A protein has these predicted regions:
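Catalytic cores of the polymerase beta-like nucleotidyltransferase superfamily
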Residues: 1-271
Length: 272
């Protein structure tokens, strides 16, 4: 990390130091002249994420920009230029020198964006998730026992999409975007790789993955410096995510409702 921050002067010298070209524009006062030395306006119109200088130099100046690229892909729905993706892949380990708090802030912004799946897929594809959220990447190597998806990773992304569909307006039962709900969606099956067992008939089981996953969730969220309440709520949802499976074909008994209410505590029923 650099000891000093240098400021460009004049304006055209400072703008190329920004993270992406779409953020490297300014209006010169008082005549409101657009200053766009890096072609940011054209990239904005094209929906392309590109760096003002080489992506390697930009990410070396501030490695958090690697995460920010994924966040903007999720937030804006932009395509990421191939050179930027290549640099993300090559320099992902540099994120290890960035404070967990800064990484967490970008991950939060990504998850509550309009297209979080897009950002997560970019993180996994470039290896950024191997550094920030390795449990998600590991799901690509785990078969979906229900054979509805290619692997548990694809299943997880589908669950994220479905969870977002459950979100409501501010006056509804699950006001969106709901960070706790979305975190639980992407983490609910992370216990499967550790609990995978193959039976003689060729089937695969993941007994206890809900409890193992809850512990793994708490550990990962603590490492990312999430607040205690978020850690508690997300890990509890992961632990309870199988609870409804036993009631798919039958009505809940009063005792089942009471047990769930006791175990879930203040978490809304609509979460699970």
């Amino acid at each position: 990390i650099r000891d000093r921050v240098t400021y460009g002067d004049p304006l055209t010298g400072d703008l190329p130091r920004r993270d992406f070209t779409v953020n490297a524009m300014a209006l010169r006062l008082p005549d409101l002249e657009l200053v766009d030395p890096c072609g940011g306006l054209a990239d904005l119109a094209a929906g392309v994420l590109r760096t003002p200088v080489s992506a390697e130099q930009s990410f070396d100046d501030d490695p958090l920009r690697i995460m920010r690229a994924a966040r903007f892909a999720a937030q804006l729905g932009f395509d990421v230029e191939m050179d930027v993706m290549t640099a993300m892949e090559e320099m992902a380990p540099r994120l290890e020198i960035v404070s967990a708090e800064r990484v967490r802030a970008e991950l939060e912004r990504l998850l509550i964006s309009p297209w979080p799946r897009r950002g997560l897929e970019l993180m996994v594809h470039t290896g950024v998730a191997d550094v920030v959220l390795p449990e998600l990447s590991a799901l690509r190597e785990t078969v979906d026992e229900h054979k509805r998806h290619k692997d548990v990773y694809e299943h997880t992304l589908t669950v994220l999409d479905q969870a977002i569909d459950l979100e409501t307006g501010p006056d509804g039962p699950v006001p969106g975007p709901d960070l706790v709900l979305r975190l639980a969606a992407i983490l609910h099956d992370i216990g499967k790789p550790a609990t995978r067992r193959f039976l003689p008939d060729g089937t695969v089981t993941f007994h206890g993955h809900d409890h193992v996953g809850a512990r793994m969730t708490a550990k990962r969220l603590r490492a990312l410096r999430f607040d205690k309440q978020t850690i508690k709520d997300v890990s509890r949802l992961v632990e309870l995510h199988l609870r409804f499976h036993g009631y798919v074909d039958a009505a809940w008994s009063d005792s089942a409702v009471r047990r769930y209410a006791t175990d879930a505590g203040p978490l809304p029923v609509s979460y699970t």
